[in-house]
């Protein structure tokens, strides 16, 4: 294999391992287990992972667990810190507390108190439910007007079960408003294979990090495309299945600058309706082509995995 082919192969292997890490943060993730995912020796995989990602594998796993815990501290303020630590793969609360303070410079409790999410009682967000809607069951759909900073956003909000959804993706690392290159690579790969013109195909972004927690340069997100069946991928193009289950789904009609507020509003609505975030994929799926919208806005579904309190 030439150098370019080798690099593509390594990229594919690393992405497969990262996909496994993201889906199994609550389980053992040592070097031996992870290198076995791609049939490489622990020593060899450790070298190529560190070179590609800029940090050793063990440090990457610990950081991901800590940042996942930090997100849960904010989005699930009533969940005990011990429960969050165990859910994120720490088998000792003392190890979790020591690592958390080393990474964030404060205790988990202080971090939770300092960084109030919008769903706290001091929230700048306010939601107004359309009273013409009826609640038929614990699975409901309601129209909402979100008020923040003197501006309003309309959305429909629903708690519902979503089926698993296979996707192909191109991974992006860095600022979340710079994902155009990843989408361009995805489309360039998918178009000649006839995947772009499949009826019902949707584009989406899957977010693996919370921008309020993870530094901008390490943010990871996937530019994705729905597919109906398993596709043979290669190099930077990978595939996995979006987790099914109970989701909070909010449909917004918004401009690019309104996406952060829409996400914060969704977390506010999740808490308002007696739910909390849980493990699973957080993503937005695009329902239109913004270039065809008269105001150049996106019609987007924001999907957050949840469970009832």
PLM regions: where:
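Short, flexible active-site loop motifs that bind/organize anionic cofactors or intermediates
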Residues: 24, 35, 74, 86, ...
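A short, Lys/Arg-enriched amphipathic alpha-helix from helix-turn-helix/homeodomain DNA-binding modules
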Residues: 2-29, 62-79
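A solvent-exposed interaction/effector surface
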Residues: 48, 59, 67, 74-75, ...
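Short helix-loop boundary/capping segments at the starts of domains
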Residues: 26, 40, 51-54, 66, ...
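Basic/polar phosphate-binding segments, predominantly the helix-turn-helix DNA-binding elements
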Residues: 1-5, 16, 28-64, 85-107
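Short amphipathic alpha-helical segments enriched in leucine
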Residues: 19-22, 39, 187, 191
